[in-house]
Amino acid sequence: MTTPFPLSRPRRLRRDDFSRRLVREHALSVNDLIYPVFVLEGENRREPVASMPGVERMSLDLLLNVAQECVKLGIPVMALFPVISSHLKTPDGKEATNPKGLIPHVVATLKENFPSLGIMTDIALDPYTSHGQDGLLDESGYILNDITVEVLKQQALTHAAAGVDIVAPSDMMDGRIGAIRQALEDQGHIHTRIMAYSAKYASAFYGPFRDAVGSAANLGKSDKKTYQMDPGNSDEALREVALDIAEGADMVMVKPGMPYLDIVRRVKDEFKVPTFAYQVSGEYAMLKAAAQNGWLDHDAVMMESLLAFKRAGADGILTYFAIDAAKKLTAHS
């Protein structure tokens, strides 16, 4: 029941900053941020990602400085995405399971130097395959589910053995969460968390990311519609989330983020589990480009966009704005 005007004047509570802050329903904090980074082989290597202004691929020695900044700012988690040399890419993505590969080495080094910083790794084959798909192909080019899951399981075990805190399967193969969870349990990795990319859509917003990890050229004109979700579907997202929770996921994710805030809200309302969203490369690139052209206020739209995730029900956000947002948040704390 609503009290009629003039007894009720909603603008009363909007009049002053103190009262606006007092009744604010949702707030963003540094604890909500996960910072995705792109890591290269070698030393002293830094490569700007042209389609993602302000984002760079970098070698481990330079990434250590970024990790230190994350710790200083209080960002809880860094998410690693590998840029794999073309000579290591094969149709079967075998490099993904190499215990001496790039990601296991980076994980072990980061955890040795920054034990309090949460480290998350991507469980997927597209950075490692010569065709740019997230799985193994049959003769017709169709992604084979079950044998792909076997490779993903080994990839997750390799990362867990290196000391990773969170494995995040982004592949969208059926049954992979259960297989990975059971394998982790069997090998004694009972504390390794799983953040499942549960509702990952076949979106046009991923373009800059594929440039960043170097899979765009391999993928070519192919798509991922046979395993990633149809953007027109909402109920299906709930079924996917339910399956992943039943199979042992500790946290679930919706990707992309801003175009799918309705899915975030439905997932949170339905399951009440830790729910995350990924503000993907295309979302980031749009806001950065508009700000660079003077069409939008950079900091204002950055913070408003992140707050929108919280209002929709997200417990946390993967965002390339994490460092900038954390600086804003800590400056006002």
Name these PLM-found stretches.
Residues 2-4, 16, 29-34, 40-333:
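Alpha/beta enzyme core
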Residues 1-24:
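N-terminal amphipathic/basic leader segments beginning at the initiator methionine
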